[in-house]
Amino acid sequence: MSHKKVVAISESSSDEEVPVAPPTAPPKKRQRKAVEEPRGHQAMVEIARQATAALKARGDPGSIIVQTFCDQTVDVDKEGNVIFTPAKQKSICNKSGSPLASVASKIFKASEHKWQSAMEFALKVLNAYQVDHSKLTLLPDEGTLECFKKAVQAYITTSKMHVTYTFTNQKTFLHVAGRLLLDFVIKAAELAPGVNPSGCVVWQHGCQSSLMCLHGSPMIQKEQLVEMDVNSENAQRALKENPEKTKIVSNRWGRNVVQFKNEDAFCCSMDVNMSGGNFSGASCGMFYTDGPKAIMAFQQIMAFLKACYPSMPNAESHLLMPLKCECNWNSSLPLLGRQTCKITPFSLASANHIDKSEVDDQKMLATLNNPAMLVFQCCNPVYRNSKAAPQKNCDFKISSVDLVSCLQIAKQIWLSTVGEKPPVKFPEFHWSDEHRYQTTILPQGQHDDDLVLF
């Protein structure tokens, strides 16, 4: 008996389409939460780790940790949880077994508290202007300086302040202002006594009526004969500012040069026997091509400070000046050439066309009565259209009046963010052999952990 399988087919299957259910929508992906920047203890621990890495990269011993005032070490685990670890009590004993107070241990603990205090000051300034502090280490490095430079720029932008630069480039202005803020942080926390992150000093110049060099000695008047390329910046400035002392002649190779004969040049007393443009190993590197213009520039800054601060007792005897440029700001190694910022008097020819009777502001009259200004440049500047020089150089350039404005803005930023007056403490300049002009730099090796070179 055979079994047949019977399949029933609906009559409507061939004439009508079976309705198909719409496809289900794929499940929506959950939006990822934006990675939040570390805050509070997490931020401080992260900065401490970066500072420790920077110390290790420089080859300096030690490490930076975050510690509470109860001697608890603060750390963050892999999941981002804050961990407080009580400090272990260590007893330091001498040979007889009696406990001794370790001075070094106390100093180290005090330094940890001061570092934490300095970090709090720095974060107050940076967080007020939403500045990314991921590269902040509180060491005089590019990462730390960049953070404070951004804070200065943000303050100028948000306050809608218009800063007029006189013989100053904006890059140098922000650079010096950042150095000043870092100096305030270090000084406020008393983190590193004797360290001057600002690179600025107060100089008792003594140039009220005669020129003095950095040695504190009178400068010597010396005739100068200089030949410059016609297309160089210095030659064009000499033709414009001193047409009676310059002329275009042909040198011994038949090339047209600008010959500048100057009888009012002044040099350091250590360079009397040196030919023009050369310095001895005992020189401070100061040289003025126009002595009367230099005296006028000193009188300008004296009158300007007196107009800004009438009650300032040393306004006419001291001035603030940057001692180091970008080349040697964060380095203790000597440079080939000048070790201090080059001081050059610049004349303000356009000030002669302003009627003094229409001006009653004493700060403006200081410049109108003395149309010259001190400008601080790179220690060993290299000008355009000049031959390459072996010295390390940068484009550092800031005038004496803009340096005053730079300090004023840094004080405003500190007062508005921290809420107290900044610790304005600049060391007074005294001559030292480390400031001498270096004619030769001995070769130096680089760090290498290998026992043999090859």
UniProtKB/Swiss-Prot annotation:
GO cellular component assignments: host cell nucleus; viral capsid
Residues annotated for Zn(2+) 1 binding in this entry: 213, 215, 268, 284
Region (Flexible loop): 226-260
Entry-annotated residues carrying Phosphotyrosine: 129
Xref: Gene3D superfamilies: Adenovirus DNA-binding, C-terminal domain superfamily/Adenovirus DNA-binding, zinc binding domain, Adenovirus DNA-binding, N-terminal domain
Pfam families registered for this protein in UniProt: Viral_DNA_bi (PF02236), Viral_DNA_Zn_bi (PF03728)
TM helices/strands, residue ranges: none
InterPro entries tied to this protein: Ad_DBP_C_sf (IPR036367), ADBP_zn-bd_sf (IPR036368), Adenovirus_DNA-bd_a (IPR003176), Adenovirus_DNA-bd_N_sf (IPR036362), Adenovirus_DNA-bd_zn-bd (IPR005376), ADV_DNB2 (IPR037540)
Binding site for Zn(2+) 2: 325, 327, 378, 394
Region (C-terminal arm, DBP binding): 440-454
Source species, domain of life: Viruses
Stretches for region Disordered: 1-41
Domains as described in the record: The C-terminal arm bridges DBP molecules together, thereby creating a chain.
Annotated function: Plays a role in the elongation phase of viral strand displacement replication by unwinding the template in an ATP-independent fashion, employing its capacity to form multimers. Also enhances the rate of initiation. Released from template upon second strand synthesis. Assembles in complex with viral pTP, viral pol, host NFIA and host POU2F1/OCT1 on viral origin of replication. Covers the whole ssDNA genome during synthesis. The complementary strand synthesis induces its relese from DNA template. May inhibit cellular transcription mediated by the interaction between host SRCAP and CBP.
Similarity section: Belongs to the adenoviridae E2A DNA-binding protein family.
Protein name, per record: DNA-binding protein
Lineage: Viruses, Varidnaviria, Bamfordvirae, Preplasmiviricota, Tectiliviricetes
Gene: DBP
